[in-house]
Design a protein with these regions (language model features):
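Acidic/His-rich, metal-assisted hydrolase cores and their charged scaffolds
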Residues: 1-137
């Protein structure tokens, strides 16, 4: 299973991830309330017109792992966001397991490093591969 985390308000990034899902033959799932709100508002206002059908969160677990691309909230390590819950195995509908991959598609905002690293450490403890931009000094 692949999960991509980004800011829910980045409509262009959400659209790009949807195109990646289509191009790779994966079904797109939105995980996190703010992503669902963005999706509805964007559709209602004429954005995301060519967006693929979205897999409901409670159906993700019934699909083969290699057929799903999840777009999840929590790129900055917010404790109540979907990615944080996934990293702690506390999400209501979805789990991440060894061999899964999480892609951080947004840069760290200074001051959030501790929260972000906490989530990344939890993911590593689950055996999840984390892909993020390298930080250099």
């Amino acid at each position: 299973r692949v999960a991509v985390t980004c800011f829910a308000t980045n409509v262009a990034r959400v659209a790009t991830v949807a195109k990646v899902a289509e191009a790779t033959g994966r079904r797109l799932a939105l995980v996190g309330r703010s992503l669902h709100r963005l999706y509805e508002v964007s559709k209602d206002n004429g954005y995301l017109q060519s967006f693929p059908d979205v897999v409901p969160e409670d159906s993700i677990g019934r699909l083969p792992r290699e057929e799903v691309l999840m777009l999840v909230t929590g790129t900055q390590g917010e404790p109540r966001a979907a990615l944080s819950k996934l990293s702690r195995n506390e999400h209501q509908h979805v789990t991440l397991n060894a061999g899964d991959t999480v892609v951080y598609s947004s840069r760290e905002i200074p001051g959030n490093e501790t929260d972000i690293n906490r989530v990344r450490n939890h993911l590593a403890g689950l055996g999840v591969e984390v892909l993020a931009e390298a930080v250099t000094a």
